[in-house]
Amino acid sequence: MSIVQSDALTFECETGNYHTFCPISCVSWLYQKIEDSFFLVIGTKTCGYFLQNAMGVMIFAEPRYAMAELEEGDISAKLNDYGELRRLCLQIKKDRNPSVIFWIGTCTTEIIKMDLEGIAPKLEAEIRVPIVVARANGLDYAFTQGEDTVLAAMAQRCPSHHYIENTNPHVPLVLFGSLPDPVVTQLVMELKKQGIIVSGWLPSKRYTELPVIQEGYYVAGVNPFLSRTATTLMRRRKTKLIGAPFPIGPDGTRAWIEKICSVFSIKPEGLAEREKDIWDSLEDYIALIRGKSVFFMGDNLLEVSLARFLTRCGMTVYEIGIPYMDKRYQAAELALLKSTCDDMNVMMPTIVEKPDNYNQLDRIRDLKPDLVITGMAHANPLEARGINTKWSVEFTFAQIHGFTNARDILELVTRPLRRNLSLSELGWDIYSKQG
């Protein structure tokens, strides 16, 4: 295990293994976000079973994704990859007529060295439908990094010329990260109140409406797991990244807006009052967790942002387990975490990259946190040991960005604690961790 000290934050790295939800699950929210798309996941039966269970979409609902199941002939190279993928894509074009087809590579395509990037341009030219290749294998990527690889591939497809004149009063700003439409509207309106116009969003609702990206444009991310997309936008598209904390919680949202305003030399107005009003409205939830402790085992790369928000709510964060940490992309978030700990006068949590779950269980046994935020695999065993847990995957699918959605975060965090209080009040102490 390696340990790195950085500005009073302690970074550790343990096993080098990923203990996370599979990154191909990004299909579940991206196919809904990009309305004219079709996602083709190229993998084995295991991938198919996972998608069926993770998404829970009935087959007669005709979702805009499918599984290209690799068979013995594919793995032994007896079948022609181009011919098989051509047959599937022509069928997709005939049945669904999408504006774009995404090929999602898996662990198996990585192991057998299937040349998806080489096949895609030839097939795209033949069938006249854009084919975007993204690797989302669990060997190299953690849970939410599946979205990162898709957006990084899409960033290279964004147009570079305007068909209408840009009338923005400032250098265009493009935001990146997949969020539900109501949250997108909220964040766009918050920036508009400060006089900042959002020129585009990656991903857009339709592939045919991808934002124009030119050299010198500003870009800002809304999620902490999009480091590859940020790198692609800076290096390939020559944009300027606004390094801001992420708009998760009232404190993060205010800091995100203030940082963007500072880049455009705009003095933000009303943010302090807006943040205070939100905190006041959350007091009924905060009272339940103030003074309690939380331990993050690590799963979705949202851990640092959530830990910072919960620290501001009065919780003590013992450890932040995280599958992968890009310290440059998350520099502003880490700085805000440090200043939050200083303001709240609490200890700095240890950040453990690629944590060893066995070691974590030992630390949980010693520390006895009031709540453990963990992947689904460990929730039931921890509950059996009398430890309150919350699935980290729920934070991925919930609306947690912006000022008004902070209540949803606390709704999730406090649910196990409220459940125990309710059981105790009913006299069912045998089922309660309070008893």
From Swiss-Prot:
Oligomeric form and interacting partners: Protochlorophyllide reductase is composed of three subunits; ChlL, ChlN and ChlB. Forms a heterotetramer of two ChlB and two ChlN subunits.
GO biological process: light-independent chlorophyll biosynthetic process; photosynthesis, dark reaction
GO cellular component, one term: chloroplast
GO molecular function: 4 iron, 4 sulfur cluster binding; ATP binding; metal ion binding; oxidoreductase activity, acting on iron-sulfur proteins as donors; oxidoreductase activity, acting on the CH-CH group of donors, iron-sulfur protein as acceptor
Cofactor(s) it depends on: [4Fe-4S] cluster
Pathway: Porphyrin-containing compound metabolism; chlorophyll biosynthesis (light-independent)
Name of the featured protein: Light-independent protochlorophyllide reductase subunit N
Family per record: Belongs to the BchN/ChlN family.
Co-factor remark: Binds 1 [4Fe-4S] cluster per heterodimer. The cluster is bound at the heterodimer interface by residues from both subunits.
Disulfide bond among keywords: no
